């Protein structure tokens, strides 16, 4: 069994239980910040990632939604190296808002991995904003339906040290698939899909928002199957990796996919420091909640915010008190 991030902190489940249900009734008016008088311009900075990934356009959409909803708030974008940089920048007071993936947020709060010896104890969540889901694709000609049937085959798990490869190894470990009984290659989506087409690979793993465009193109080019997990496998994965949550790849997400596929994912979180004014966080949370639908039209990944309880449930670290009060 490979070593997982969270063996020492099983009590993290209380974080996702801190809010037993998200707000579903009509919204109350946002409560003003006590530390920011009405009419005073507030300039905030949101940390994203490089412009080629998902975080940058997502951050841009969030910044625009907040700035347009409240003329007294301006949100500026800050490109960064991604989740780790954003967590550290929040801790150091260099940014006000930051996009941080759930696994990194948990590691930061608890001083694990890159944060060993330097935890970000004050990291808190306003809302989950989009998911990345585990997707496995294989040629239908193999005649397999489940991930565990990949044992003994040639598998592209994702680039070295990527979240795609990390999640793939967690999955394969649960399924009893190792480098001694199978061929695991650190190919990404592009080279992995090419390997499927050429016959040099049997399956590819993707860990991203769905649909993954490369998988859609591959399923257009040849009959493919989106592989499933058994309930036992999902239970094992989720019980040992508390930053993951259960989700579904809906039927017809990919060409030829005629049924829902149960899977797991990780949420990208909009984070702040514990010390951010509670009234301001309440207002920001309200803006995001009220604009969830329009945010999805700005970037498809953000449609998840419109799903019941997505924004405030199954979180790996605590909500900020202002966000918790809103929900």
Which residue stretches match the model-derived regions?
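Extracytoplasmic
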Residues: 41, 70-72, 82-85, 92, ...
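Structured segments of extracytoplasmic/periplasmic soluble domains
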Residues: 49, 61, 65-72, 89, ...
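Pocket-lining segment of extracytoplasmic ligand-binding domains
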Residues: 102-104, 112-114, 142, 178-271, ...
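Bilobed "Venus flytrap"/periplasmic-binding protein-like clamshell domains
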Residues: 41-69, 73-74, 132-198, 313, ...
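Short, low-complexity disordered leader/linker segments with a strong preference
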Residues: 1-42
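N-terminal (or domain-start) structured segment
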Residues: 31, 36-107
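A structural signal for short loop-to-beta-strand junctions that line the ligand-binding cleft
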Residues: 116-129, 134, 253-262
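Segments of small-molecule ligand-sensing domains
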Residues: 261-326
């Amino acid at each position: 069994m490979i070593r997982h991030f969270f063996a020492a902190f099983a009590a993290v489940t209380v974080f996702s239980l801190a809010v037993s249900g998200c707000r579903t009734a009509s919204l109350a008016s946002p409560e003003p910040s006590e530390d920011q008088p009405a009419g005073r311009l507030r300039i905030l900075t949101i940390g994203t990632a490089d412009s080629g990934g998902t975080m940058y356009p997502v951050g841009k959409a969030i910044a625009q939604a907040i700035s347009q909803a409240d003329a007294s708030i301006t949100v500026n974008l800050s490109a960064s190296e991604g989740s780790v940089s954003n967590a550290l920048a929040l801790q150091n007071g260099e940014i006000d808002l930051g996009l941080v993936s759930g696994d990194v947020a948990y590691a930061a709060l608890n001083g694990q991995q890159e944060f060993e010896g330097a935890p970000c104890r004050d990291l808190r969540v306003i809302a989950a904003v989009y998911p990345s889901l585990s997707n496995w694709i294989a040629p239908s000609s193999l005649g397999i339906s489940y991930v565990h049937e990949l044992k003994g085959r040639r598998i592209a798990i994702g680039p070295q040290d990527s979240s795609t490869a990390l999640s793939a190894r967690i999955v394969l470990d649960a399924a009893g698939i190792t480098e001694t009984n199978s061929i695991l290659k650190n190919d990404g989506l592009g080279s992995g899909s090419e390997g499927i087409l050429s016959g040099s690979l049997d399956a590819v793993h993707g860990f991203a928002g769905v649909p993954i465009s490369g998988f859609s193109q591959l399923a257009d080019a040849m009959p493919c199957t989106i592989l499933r997990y058994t309930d036992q496998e999902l239970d094992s994965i989720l019980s040992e990796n508390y930053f993951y949550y259960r989700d579904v790849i809906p039927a017809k997400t990919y060409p030829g996919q005629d049924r829902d596929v149960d899977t797991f994912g990780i949420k990208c979180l909009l984070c702040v420091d514990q010390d951010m004014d509670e009234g301001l966080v309440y207002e920001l949370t309200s803006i995001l909640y009220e604009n969830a639908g329009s945010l999805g039209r700005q970037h498809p990944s953000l449609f998840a915010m419109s799903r019941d309880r997505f924004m405030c449930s199954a979180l790996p670290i605590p909500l900020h008190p202002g966000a918790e009060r809103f929900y």
